[in-house]
From Swiss-Prot:
Gene Ontology biological-process entries: ATP synthesis coupled electron transport; photosynthesis, light reaction; ubiquinone biosynthetic process
Family under the similarity heading: Belongs to the complex I subunit 4L family.
Record's subunit section: NDH is composed of at least 16 different subunits, 5 of which are encoded in the nucleus.
Protein name per UniProt: NAD(P)H-quinone oxidoreductase subunit 4L, chloroplastic
InterPro entries, alphabetized: NADH_UbQ_OxRdtase_chain4L/K (IPR001133), NUOK/Mnh_C1-like (IPR039428)
Record keyword Amino-acid biosynthesis present: no
Free-text function comment from the UniProt entry: NDH shuttles electrons from NAD(P)H:plastoquinone, via FMN and iron-sulfur (Fe-S) centers, to quinones in the photosynthetic chain and possibly in a chloroplast respiratory chain. The immediate electron acceptor for the enzyme in this species is believed to be plastoquinone. Couples the redox reaction to proton translocation, and thus conserves the redox energy in a proton gradient.
Length: 101
């Protein structure tokens, strides 16, 4: 695959995730958009590692670290969302101002 095609696809994924993160009012949707952004970053790591330095696996190792961090982030985020839903009966971002009270 051509480098430019992969970078354009990764940029589209990143921008879709960023747009969704900025405009979403649902916490679960915001977490999904954050995962989309992290997957676009992973795509860039693997692409640049494949195209520019085949002898070392630095991009793939960074990708594995990002996947591990994203899994931990998703688990913690969903635990927080379920706790907020149990207490507030809503997962909308603008209704869950826990620090104001």
């Amino acid at each position: 695959m051509i480098l430019e095609h992969v970078l354009v696809l990764s940029a589209y994924l990143f921008l879709i995730g960023l747009y969704g993160l900025i405009t979403s009012r649902n916490m679960v949707r915001a977490l999904m958009c954050l995962e989309l952004i992290l997957n676009a970053v992973n795509m860039n790591f693997v692409t640049f590692s494949d195209f520019f330095d085949n002898s070392q696996l630095k991009g793939e190792i960074f990708c594995i670290f990002v996947i591990a961090i994203a899994a931990a982030e998703a688990a913690i985020g969903l635990a927080i969302v379920s706790s907020i839903y149990r207490n507030r009966k809503s997962i909308r971002i603008n209704q869950s101002t826990l620090l104001n009270k």
